[in-house]
Amino acid sequence: MTNNKIIVALDVPDTESAIALIDKLESVTFWKVGLELFTSSGPRILEVLKSRQKRIFLDLKFHDIPNTVAGACRGAARYGVDLMTIHATSGRDALKAAKEAVEEGAAQAGVKPSKLIAVTVLTSISARQLALDLKIPVELPEYALDMALMAQEVGLDGAVCSPQEVAQLRQICGDDFVLVCPGVRPTWAEAKDQKRSLTPSQAIQAGADYLVIGRPITAAAEPELAWKRIAQELTTVA
């Protein structure tokens, strides 16, 4: 059984732990490499995944001034990963510079350009936190849409959003805009620090292209069984 809509999060502290998990979940074809693992392992983990013909979501969420994010994206694009992320709150100029840099880096390395997607609002952020802590005076769904539209306007390939915003983004941004949803939780898994979650089938029905799922699979007593259980759930989605 395979399901190319599921991206499993390699949220482990080192290369050895990552390899053990990859070997345990042989059926998984798409893996997310985030800050913790990349800081520890560096490009080596990308080489490991490439050697096993796996797809890669490099989720480093770049967030800096335009020149800096451009340099980071140019370098990351040379690895030939499938997806990479930048915070939409870096601003319009940074998003545009990053997109151009991805094209440049891929051309220099002779690889296919990565799809660059913008993080709209972290799934750990609630509407209350957006208003009270971040002092953003708009409703959370509206803010997520604004960030996605800005990214689309400057040429980015898609956005990361919570499952609760995905239907609105799909309707307004169109079918060609890639939507990636973390914060997805099966009914049998704990929500933990995800504030705006849906089940995998609900998120796909709402319009998500990819689901990022970590602990419900990787922390399960039987990770392969948990993955197959979710993949089976998605086969019922029209």
Swiss-Prot record:
Subunit structure and binding partners: Homodimer.
Highest taxon, organism lineage: Bacteria
PROSITE patterns given in the database record: OMPDECASE
Fetch the Pfam families from UniProt. Answer: OMPdecase (PF00215)
Query: Which InterPro entries is this protein grouped with?
Result: Aldolase_TIM, OMPdecase, OMPdecase_AS, OMPdecase_bac, OMPdeCOase_dom, RibuloseP-bd_barrel
Q: What is the name attached to this protein's record?
A: Orotidine 5'-phosphate decarboxylase
- Where does this protein act, in terms of pathway? Pyrimidine metabolism; UMP biosynthesis via de novo pathway; UMP from orotate: step 2/2
Residue positions annotated to bind substrate are 11, 32, 59-68, 123, 185, 194, 214-215
Instruction: Identify the species of origin.
Output: Trichormus variabilis (strain ATCC 29413 / PCC 7937) (Anabaena variabilis)
